[in-house]
């Protein structure tokens, strides 16, 4: 997030207090299989440590400072810290399988939407958790992103706002997909969201909530 240390419990609580419709977070597997909440695959940018998450145990990750004294959280802690619906982005099939276990154990189908840049990860979580809402995320894409989303059973496409065109929006609508734009942090980007009549947008700044429907 833009106002709190990103992907920390502090940031998620702030997003909930700001009244966001949905909180987006990113999941990675630690060396010992914990679902760790962090955007990057490495800890370097957002903590005082270095190296890949996948090469560190949960205990090692817990020892890091994620900003303002915050610790790297696991997914279950976020579930307990906020009541806001969540969108959990997974990076691969292995994470899909780990997340599926948590979703079944805690009956999260109605509360958690699952997204990924990886088609096979979306397909896997759809297979493992019947009824789960899924989204295919894309940064560099063409109209084929709509066909890819339909093929893996996604209900939503989350698309880089800088590359979004009316042609893609119309194709997505014709295919029955919802469309979320990211990352929307400026008034110009907000105007584009409204002009294209998107279903929502992802932002780093919860205060922008007063001007539209947003996730953080």
Model-derived segments and spans:
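Phosphate-group recognition and catalysis centered on beta-loop-alpha active-site segments
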Residues: 1-216
